């Protein structure tokens, strides 16, 4: 069975408030995630919300990586969508554990665009 894309949806709970509010750190962490996944960044956009929260998007040649934070809820939502390769979600969670403080991760792997 062939698919057009692979979508990884990551929900992180019990995240550290101060880390979520450190916009520069979150931007660098997201860029390094793209590098760790061996993807090519072609565009990026980041927005700091007031009084708190952050959203970021990396357009990669393979598709996109996005992050949204809710410091008041100690929550991060990350999406990784690619049209070229599947990723080992365990390696991604290991990377996130090395770079973010959180208590619980929920991951959904979605195969997109089934081709007959």
UniProtKB/Swiss-Prot annotation:
**One Gene Ontology term of the molecular function aspect:** adenosylmethionine decarboxylase activity
Entry PTM: Is synthesized initially as an inactive proenzyme. Formation of the active enzyme involves a self-maturation process in which the active site pyruvoyl group is generated from an internal serine residue via an autocatalytic post-translational modification. Two non-identical subunits are generated from the proenzyme in this reaction, and the pyruvate is formed at the N-terminus of the alpha chain, which is derived from the carboxyl end of the proenzyme.
Q: Enzyme class, one word?
A: lyase
Names of the cofactor(s): pyruvate
Name the UniProt key words of this record, in alphabetical order: Autocatalytic cleavage, Decarboxylase, Lyase, Polyamine biosynthesis, Pyruvate, S-adenosyl-L-methionine, Schiff base, Spermidine biosynthesis, Zymogen
Question: For the modification Pyruvic acid (Ser), which residues carry it?
Answer: 63
> Where, by residue number, does the polypeptide cross the bilayer?
none
Per the Swiss-Prot or TrEMBL record, the active site comprises 63, 68, 83
Q: How is the cofactor bound?
A: Binds 1 pyruvoyl group covalently per subunit.
Recorded GO cellular component terms are: cytosol
> In chain numbering, where does the site feature Cleavage (non-hydrolytic) fall?
62-63
Q: So what does this thing catalyse?
A: S-adenosyl-L-methionine + H(+) = S-adenosyl 3-(methylsulfanyl)propylamine + CO2
Pathway assigned in UniProt: Amine and polyamine biosynthesis; S-adenosylmethioninamine biosynthesis; S-adenosylmethioninamine from S-adenosyl-L-methionine: step 1/1
Q: Give the InterPro entries listed for this entry.
A: AdoMetDC_fam_prok, S-AdoMet_deCO2ase_core, S-AdoMet_deCOase_pro-enz
Q: Might you name a Gene Ontology BP term for this protein?
A: spermidine biosynthetic process
**Which EC number(s) does the record attach to this protein?**
4.1.1.50
Q: How does it assemble?
A: Heterotetramer of two alpha and two beta chains arranged as a dimer of alpha/beta heterodimers.
Similarity remark: Belongs to the prokaryotic AdoMetDC family. Type 1 subfamily.
According to its UniProt entry, what is the function of this protein? Answer: Catalyzes the decarboxylation of S-adenosylmethionine to S-adenosylmethioninamine (dcAdoMet), the propylamine donor required for the synthesis of the polyamines spermine and spermidine from the diamine putrescine.
Q: What is this protein called?
A: S-adenosylmethionine decarboxylase proenzyme
Please name the source species.
Clostridium botulinum (strain Loch Maree / Type A3)
